[in-house]
A protein has these predicted regions:
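Active-site regions of metal-assisted phosphoester/phosphodiester hydrolases
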Residues: 1-130
């Protein structure tokens, strides 16, 4: 599923989508298409997508649905927290953003808090923002 929020950052409206997609590849692809449809039904805004996509592929599967309008933020593996091998947790941004920095939080506390390590990105709105 997904949650969509619109917030104002320094007077600029930004859309944020938090997702936790299904374990099934078929359902993940359906969920991704539903999220894209929901976004297309709204006015265009600078948009950040993020969450546990449960997608093991680097660019395939449900990620294809997002690729036309969103760039993946470069991230290291964040799953499983004790021995990260997979990039299941993603951040994707519309062309309105420039990625200044990104990473995976690897503290001892993070390793026991969840089976996923937290991911983060420092983003800057470009001059092309809406």
């Amino acid at each position: 599923g997904a949650v969509i929020a619109e917030v104002r950052i320094r007077g600029i409206r930004v859309r944020i989508v938090a997702m936790h997609l299904d374990l099934s590849g078929l359902w993940r692809r359906r969920q991704a298409r539903a999220i894209i449809s929901a976004l297309e039904a709204r006015r265009p805004l600078p948009t950040i997508l993020m969450g546990d996509l449960n997608e093991w592929s680097l660019h395939g599967g449900c990620l294809r649905a997002f690729a036309a309008g969103f760039a993946q933020v470069p991230l290291e593996p964040s799953f499983h927290s004790r021995r990260p091998l997979a990039r299941l947790d993603r951040i994707m941004v519309s062309p309105h953003f420039r990625v200044m920095a990104s990473g995976v939080h690897r503290s001892a506390t993070a390793r026991v808090a969840s089976d996923h390590l937290p991911v983060w990105a420092d983003l800057e709105l470009t001059d092309a923002h809406v």
